[in-house]
Amino acid sequence: MKMNHHYGELKASYLFVDIAHKVAAYQEAHPEKEIIRLGIGDVTQPLAKCVVTAMQDAAAEMGTKEGFHGYGPEQGYPFLKQAIQGYYASRNTKLDEDEIFISDGAKSDLANVLGLFDVDNTVLVPDPVYPTYVDDNVTDGRKIVYSRTNQENGFLGMPDDSVKADIIYICSPNTPTGAAYTREQLKEWVAYAKKNNAVILYDAAYECFITDEHLARSIFEIEGARECAIEICSFSKIAGFTGTRCGYTIVPKELEREGMNLNKLWLRRQTTKFNGVPYIVQRAAAAVFTESGMAEIQQNLDYYRKNAKVIADALDECGVWYCGGKNSPYIWLRCPGNMKSWEFFDWLLENCGVVGTPGVGFGECGEGYFRLTAFGDAEKTKAAAERIKTAIKAL
């Protein structure tokens, strides 16, 4: 038999393994010192009470003959799709119910949606990049080109007419950099996609952190995007569903390529290869969009926003350049003293007992930069910020 040898082309990822080894060695050498981890990309606040109640009620419902649910609609229950419709409508973005597809998370859909496109397509991804974008396409054998970002452009790549791409990845606010596109910038990307007959895969997993009214929370706020974009979103960051698993993808009915309607194709794909998200989880997700749900999740989001501000304020006081932190849980900073990413990791661990993520782990353009996150404990984040501030000032 023949195997998919493209899996052999995946680059070994030692980033988090190396971090774990370095932290373990430091802890063994300094058992008396407290290590504060600001590299975590997972949420830490518990699910909202109304979400837990909805889950409990749905579980109890499943234990009755009248309330039992077996196989559900592969594209999601109407009650959740309508709740998402309302969420977008509150921001003046109109969606049809049959354009919303419920999934077990953004990561799955980011990979699965590629099945709609031939492998003989060129993919444009940013550098630095969320590694999944690259790996999903390497394993399919697609050609990948990079939009190289830097401090000068605020780590927000813009269209280059000399580059032809068929599939365009945009994540805003971005992981790992925390940078977010304005509506005017997204208009340029939509124009580029339409000019090149390309499709934008818009990762909106962090839209809930946006507070700046000049920033778009959905690509569909941009005129013309319904003809060239698919939006993928998640309950992981807005509601802490990293362990509960639920997300959704929006495929507009206007989106067509080579005479094929992508909304219909995605429906066929899901009904063929996916059995849907559990009823209990979808009831929990729908509770997020209730009045009490939105109030509760805002408390958690504000908790993380305050952590981000604590870190950003410390960097401001030290005169360290960074992006993110204001509409994102990620703070992407220039390593002080012209240190390389791993050099700064070692320095930060040794001098502050603080752990973050070396920027070079996300791509060549991340060298010399470093990621801190706001998902930690508030008191520990304050302590880490003070340690960092003191150490950098002493450089």
Range-by-range predicted roles:
Residues I222-D302, K309, D313, K393:
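Conserved core segment of the aminotransferase class I/II
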Residues Q282, A286, L301-A312, Y322-C335, ...:
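Conserved glycine-rich beta-strand-loop-beta hairpin in the small C-terminal domain of fold type I
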Residues K2-D104, N112, V288-E291, L395:
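N-terminal small-domain helix-loop-helix segment of the aminotransferase-like
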Residues E66-A193, E207-I222:
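Conserved core of the PLP fold type I
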Residues V125, Y146, Y202, G356-P358:
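Hydrophobic residues in well-ordered beta-strands that form the structural core
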Residues H30, D140, K195-N196, C318, ...:
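Helix C-cap/helix->beta junction micro-motif
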Residues G86, K94, L124, N338, ...:
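PLP-dependent enzyme catalytic core of the Aspartate aminotransferase-like
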